[in-house]
Amino acid sequence: MAEEEFSNTTHETFNFTLHTTLGVTTKLVLPTPAKPILPVQTGEQAQQEEQSSGMTIFFSLLVLAICIILVHLLIRYRLHFLPESVAVVSLGILMGAVIKVIEFKKLANWKEEEMFRPNMFFLLLLPPIIFESGYSLHKGNFFQNIGSITLFAVFGTAISAFVVGGGIYFLGQADVISKLNMTDSFAFGSLISAVDPVATIAIFNALHVDPVLNMLVFGESILNDAVSIVLTNTAEGLTRKHMSDVSGWQTFSQALGYFLKMFFGSAALGTLTGLISALVLKHIDLRKTPSLEFGMMIIFAYLPYGLAEGISLSGIMAILFSGIVMSHYTHHNLSPVTQILMQQTLRTVAFLCETCVFAFLGLSIFSFPHKFEISFVIWCIVLVLFGRAVNIFPLSYLLNFFRDHKITPKMMFIMWFSGLRGAIPYALSLHLGLEPMEKRQLIGTTTIVIVLFTILLLGGSTMPLIRLVDIEDARARRRSKKDVNLSKTEKMGNAIESEHLSELTEEEYEAHYIRQQDLKGFMWLDAKYLNPFFTRRLTQEDLHHGRIQMKSLTNKWYEEVRQGPSGSEDDEQELF
């Protein structure tokens, strides 16, 4: 009779040793069960994961829908004194409190759904916002002030990061607040230096403040986000390299080299991608198939972000410069239909992403355990305001030696006051790999408090302050109070400048754009060589086809409006 014994069983093979009465030993080796082709969950675990993902999608869409209704109510009932970002953050806080009560009563557990995931923010929500900012940029005012904007965005952000980071480090060494090492202090100073003056820009547009002030604040905020992310990544890179045995000068030089590589490498990659997209859509005529044309634009819009992140550069910096270049060259190679479609789609997607970010920012108060240290929070707020002042006032006085349009003390004060913090600092704070966990909770809690403090208090009081210091343009003073509108959604306007160079023929471009304008430097080089090389000059046939296409769309719209939903023409007189 055979006796069966199981032995030597491992994850790789199943070994069976059979001993028989004849003394013959037979060892059978059975193959390992096949692994799944993809590392996916199966069975009950897969079903639970699918249910959790479904609830996350449902919850996110529900939050967006409620926020859209809220923005609609702000516009309809003319609650123009309240910026959209402040309203959406407040709604997020309210919804977070309700969810916390539901969880406490054990009616449901939505804790996972309300979590603000940094990877989702950086991969899905932030790229459309940054690309739309670059694509809708008024490039005339931007490049006329590019020197001042770059100085504020790069050197100003670095100054603020060093002031905040250095202050936190030395206060910790003096046992005034919790201790952080040098790299962690600089990482926190870098992430908290990212300004996000969405509410302030809406107020600037509503009150028609000085256009130079508007562009300085807006331009700084666009570049500042990318610079802050690069500085934070630089600090994290130094932490990963364990540079405790390296001298201070070597640390500084390596950090500077890493920053320059990230900044200029990412900017060059984004610029190159934008130029390639212009050449592709210039020589491959997709204007008669707008769906293919639009699809190609969407691909090129996200392409530099993925490539930059894949080769350890800054995807945010790359996608920003790609958006600027594509709006300057590629946009004019598109058909009129795709031009309009691209602008409206980018506005819509950016609005949804911004709304989602601000809503989940409010929800995040209840998302994870907090470590609140009152002295740390107060000193951080003081350092943030002081770092912003050290950034704005000295650089403004320095720039006034070289500027024709001077930055007045009132403008400096508004620029200092408009340094609101948004979702980028919070997402970066969750992305930091700080140890132990109490340190991460302290940084996350402090960042949330600073962000909410600047958005709710500073953002909500910007309009009364502008009224008080009388920084409005002369035309704005003649506007009645009922015309003041703080809704970014309602005041979107035209994203791209009105002069569509692609609508000019070769002769018209030469006669009306180059000869009649006194262009110098890069603007002359761009108008004379770069623009003709990267954009398509229309023939008379192309121009005629474009006009027919737009006329057909206009007639179709008019027919739908004239007939109305019932198909009758009885209401035609009421429309006109």
Curated annotation (Swiss-Prot):
It is a multi-pass membrane protein. GO terms for molecular function: potassium:proton antiporter activity; sodium:proton antiporter activity. Disruption phenotype: The deficient mice have no obvious intestinal phenotype, show no defect in Na(+)-absorption, have normal serum Na(+) levels and no signs of diarrhea. Apically expressed Slc9a2 and Slc9a3 are increased in the small intestine of the Slc9a8-deficient mice in compensation. Deficient mice have a reduced gastric mucosal surface pH, a higher incidence of developing gastric ulcer, and a decreased of mucin-2 (Muc2) expression. The intestinal mucosa in Slc9a8-deficient mice is prone to bacterial adhesion and penetration, which in turn promotes inflammation. Predominantly expressed in the liver, skeletal muscle, kidney, and testis. Expressed in both renal cortex and medulla. Detected throughout the entire gastrointestinal tract, with high expression detected in stomach, duodenum and ascending colon. In gastric epithelium; expressed in the glands within the fundus and pylorus regions. The chain crosses the membrane at residues 55-75, 79-99, 118-138, 151-171, 186-206, 256-276, 306-326, 349-369, 374-394, 412-432, 446-466. It comes from the Eukaryota. GO terms for cellular component: acrosomal vesicle; apical plasma membrane; Golgi apparatus; Golgi membrane; multivesicular body membrane; trans-Golgi network membrane. Keywords: Antiport, Cell membrane, Cytoplasmic vesicle, Differentiation, Endosome, Golgi apparatus, Ion transport, Membrane, Phosphoprotein, Sodium, Sodium transport, Spermatogenesis, Transmembrane, Transmembrane helix, Transport. GO terms for biological process: acrosome assembly; potassium ion transport; proton transmembrane transport; regulation of Golgi lumen acidification; regulation of intracellular pH; sodium ion transmembrane transport; sodium ion transport. The keyword Transferase does not apply. Its main location: Golgi. PANTHER family: SODIUM/HYDROGEN EXCHANGER, SODIUM_HYDROGEN EXCHANGER 8. NCBIfam families: b_cpa1. Na(+)/H(+) antiporter. Mediates the electoneutral exchange of intracellular H(+) ions for extracellular Na(+) in 1:1 stoichiometry. Acts as an Na(+)/H(+) exchanger in the trans-Golgi. Contributes to the regulation of pH regulation of Golgi apparatus, and consequently, in protein trafficking and endosomal morphology. Plays a crucial role in germ cells in acrosome biogenesis and sperm development, probably by playing a role in the fusion of the Golgi-derived vesicles that form the acrosomal cap. Can also be active at the cell surface of specialized cells. This is Sodium/hydrogen exchanger 8. It comes from Mus musculus (Mouse).
